[in-house]
Amino acid sequence: MKQLILVLCLVAISCKEKRYHDQEHSTTVEHVTGALEDILQFQKKMNDEFKDPETSPLPDRYRKDFETLDFYEPDTTYRIAAKFSRTPEALPFMMPTTTERETEEVVFGIITFNLKGSTHKLEVYQNQELLQEEKYSDYLFLPFADLTNGEETYGGGRYLDLTIPKGDTILLDFNKAYNPYCAYNPKYSCPLVPKQNRLDIAITAGVKAFKKD
């Protein structure tokens, strides 16, 4: 896979030095392998969901021949330990969707990260209706847009599901970016990406646009 940088073992003079480098190499390989397994597991889960008539957003005419979503190749460049800053003073607001429906959200925090030589910020939201359900008590919603939209990815942007971190760091993995359901079926109502979450870079990771032909 592209961008997967493995630590090469240097030829060491002593056995002790060689064991040190071998251990470092092994630890790095395990870290990368674990990240890849996590991404591939996400892709499998998505495909299983789309194949299942009980959970698939696809109309029957598309689901019956469905095999797999189109993903970018896993790329750990887009798996980032980002800074997380809470915004406890934020007030609820109504987020527009692709229909007349609106969702009540609160800006729960700001995510700051470095990618492609520059610093970027994204707002992350907590849905006030979902908050009433215990299983969503630590759920955060991150809609974002980037320069791939309308070309390689869905024109309306993509989403990430996150969990409230315990500290001030959060794992931001764009390999798990997915399309809103309305990208597959117009019957769904999907939150629109706020203008402050429009990135001026291309995020070539996650799910690509759905080809209906």
Predicted regions and their residues:
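Sec-dependent signal peptide recognition
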Residues: 1-7
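C-terminal motif of bacterial Sec signal peptides marking the signal peptidase cleavage site
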Residues: 11-14
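Start-of-domain marker
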Residues: 17-89
